[in-house]
Amino acid sequence: MKLRSSAITQGVQRSPNRAMLRAVGFEDDDFNKPIIGIANGYSTITPCNIGLNDLAKQAEKAIKDWDGMPQMFGTITVSDGISMGTEGMKYSLVSREVIADSIETACNAQSMDGVLAIGGCDKNMPGAMLAMARMNIPGIFVYGGTIKPGKLNGEDLTVVSAFEAVGQLTSGKITKEKLIEVEKHCIPGAGSCGGMFTANTMSAAIEAMGLSLPHSSTMAAEDQEKIKSTQKSAEVLIKAIKENIRPLDLLTKQAFENAISVVMAVGGSTNAVLHLLAIAHSSGVELSLDEFEKIRQRVPVLCDLKPSGKYVTVDLHKAGGIPQVMKILLEAGLINENCRTIENKTIKEMLLDVPAEPPSDQDVIRPFDSPVYKKGHLAILKGNLATEGSVAKISGIKEPILTGPAKVFESEEDCLKAILTEQIHSGDVVVIRNEGPVGGPGMREMLAPTSAIVGQGLGEKVALITDGRFSGGTYGLVVGHVAPEAAVGGNIALIQDGDSITVDAIQKLIQVNIEEAELKRRRSLWVKPKPKYNSGVLGKYATLVSSSSKGAVTDQNC
């Protein structure tokens, strides 16, 4: 087997290259071993990533034990939970591209033979997957693990509990002292946010596509099994290099369909739609919003998980994790059994010893004939407000239909102020625009407004639509990723206060109820907004980024 790294290790002309490698610990025999990058997302910025360095060191040792040469390098992270509701959140989706670009750059510049990527916070997972697909060298993803639930008076808490408590405080439902108690107890240690929010959703999707080990996506960050799984991941990667198993061998159209099915079954985040579209783009796989809707129609929500449900991800792990969910779907004919994994097994082989039915002593994972919801919770809506499409999350509500007057805001901050001063009422359709990939730029998540609405008891009585995104912690009648976005002239830019808007997840419709002639009149008066940034990261991003309906990628025109 000829190693890619031979480009820097073999031949007399590579003596200077070897000299550099000797300075970082290479010996004579090491130049014939595979060089494996460890893309380490360690950071003290966020609890999601604070434990990653320990896992990276375990991976480093295991790679050496299996006769590989590890080379560790850092990737960035942005804490969505900390930047949420601020200008800093504009950098969150941007960080997905920075992570992908940094991994691709480091691995390709150093002619690495494989990569083991370790991540925790939301954009770490899709960022790593974009890089793996682009490079197509053997790779495996190690998830840093989920956080255990916080506890207060016997109740399980997550970070979303704190966001909702803000709304509860402003509506007089709790005291400031109770808010502080929630704040102090909702995040007890290391790990990614504990519900089926974006990080856990994307780790589940990666496991479903075969690029991480079975059960690894639901493990708690602080449990010993996470270390063992990391060590095993290093061993599996070495074997994949020897067998030349590459990401694009695994990232087939059927693998993406499997991932979408799992996302629906676990009640995952709307962000999975955006990220899977982007990963498919980097993989050369044709994937559209319409395919998410087709899968939603046949795949039920099987897991009762927060934000809209009862349990957290560690409970899912105890109940059998993603393999149990996949086995139920496999038995129902809803996932492809022939897709392969990084262990060079088919999905059918991987799930051979998993029971066909979930354990009877739990209700985290429901049997197929007794689901939480009969259809998936991520609906693709189209209409004159979203001709390219939009993504509605309809879990946690009894009636996913609302027609009401628009209350229009040009930014998240303006909207949140109106909510907290009780200017939003039952039946309203809240519109937050100019928060899209270009207009934000960066497509901020609207967790603060949606949580405040829920906290005030309006979660089933108010709809919120935006060209921005939603956190995985959001639930209620919310519609995001509206495309085309306002900044490029989408019809969401033409809505005025008081316009009647219909959101109907049953008919898959999102529309403003005015005459086409009036829309044309307003369009004739519309002026394209000036860019908010003319330089730097955000200026560059706004210039390059595609529509959210295409995954908000930055290399679409390459």
UniProtKB/Swiss-Prot annotation:
Binding site residues for Mg(2+) = 80, 122-123, 445
Q: Which UniProt keywords apply?
A: 2Fe-2S, Amino-acid biosynthesis, Branched-chain amino acid biosynthesis, Iron, Iron-sulfur, Lyase, Magnesium, Metal-binding
List N6-carboxylysine occurrences by residue: 123
Its pathway?
A: Amino-acid biosynthesis; L-isoleucine biosynthesis; L-isoleucine from 2-oxobutanoate: step 3/4; Amino-acid biosynthesis; L-valine biosynthesis; L-valine from pyruvate: step 3/4
Which residues are listed for [2Fe-2S] cluster binding in this entry? Answer: 48, 121, 193
EC number(s) given by UniProt: 4.2.1.9
An example GO biological process term is: L-valine biosynthetic process
- Catalytic activity, per the record? (2R)-2,3-dihydroxy-3-methylbutanoate = 3-methyl-2-oxobutanoate + H2O; (2R,3R)-2,3-dihydroxy-3-methylpentanoate = (S)-3-methyl-2-oxopentanoate + H2O
Enzyme active site: 471
InterPro entries membership = DHAD_IlvD/Edd, Dihydro-acid_dehy_C, DihydroxyA_deHydtase, DiOHA_6PGluconate_deHydtase_CS, ILV_EDD_C, ILV_EDD_N, IlvD/EDD_N
Q: Spell out the molecular function terms from Gene Ontology.
A: 2 iron, 2 sulfur cluster binding; dihydroxy-acid dehydratase activity; magnesium ion binding
Q: Give the protein's cofactors.
A: [2Fe-2S] cluster; Mg(2+)
Bilayer-spanning residue ranges: none
Q: How is the cofactor bound?
A: Binds 1 [2Fe-2S] cluster per subunit. This cluster acts as a Lewis acid cofactor.
Provide the function of this protein.
Functions in the biosynthesis of branched-chain amino acids. Catalyzes the dehydration of (2R,3R)-2,3-dihydroxy-3-methylpentanoate (2,3-dihydroxy-3-methylvalerate) into 2-oxo-3-methylpentanoate (2-oxo-3-methylvalerate) and of (2R)-2,3-dihydroxy-3-methylbutanoate (2,3-dihydroxyisovalerate) into 2-oxo-3-methylbutanoate (2-oxoisovalerate), the penultimate precursor to L-isoleucine and L-valine, respectively.
The family assignment reads:
Belongs to the IlvD/Edd family.
Q: How does it assemble?
A: Homodimer.
Protein name listed in UniProt: Dihydroxy-acid dehydratase
Its taxonomic placement starts with: Bacteria, Bacillati, Cyanobacteriota, Cyanophyceae, Synechococcales
